Amino acid sequence: DRSPQSLAQDDTTHMKSLYAATRVTLADPLHLILGARYTKWRVDTLTYSMEKNHTTPYAGLVFDINDNWSTYASYTSIFQPQNDRDSSGKYLAPITGNNYELGLKSDWMNSRLTTTLAIFRIEQDNVAQSTGTPIPGSNGETAYKAVDGTVSKGVEFELNGAITDNWQLTFGATRY
């Protein structure tokens, strides 16, 4: 009889990224922001390896209403490796998806006080969901399954203030 292999093993995760972004004035007061991040991710275990390469683009438009107020719309794709495992002990594939945001920003006192109010929608695939059962051969580690079609939407508010040059405060609130 052989006992199940323990998941307490020497796993190694490698991640390398490269990104670039630019902001272009299309016609004052309209600005275009474009960017991309390339990520190379690999996990090596005693029993298998998994590698994923992904480019996550970003695009945004900013319209300056006046010196203090601007409105914006943005899009970015999502690529987020995760550490959860399935019932066979293998790591789940990275979370992928899209993020959409529309907002209003203000800037006061030479940027010593800024605010942001935004609405957002996040669409994700491969999101880990607990199966409620342990992985066979583990020390009770819970198994997860990847779920597609997860959607989050809501509104967020952020307030940033520089009380002094060395003391800055941030307040943020999000409602899903």
Outline where the language-model segments fall.
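Transmembrane beta-barrel outer-membrane domains
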Residues: Q9-M15, Y48-H54, A93-G97, W108, ...
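Short beta-strand segments enriched in hydrophobic/aromatic residues
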Residues: L26, Y38, I65, S77, ...
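Gram-negative outer-membrane beta-barrel transporters
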Residues: D28-P29, K145-Y176
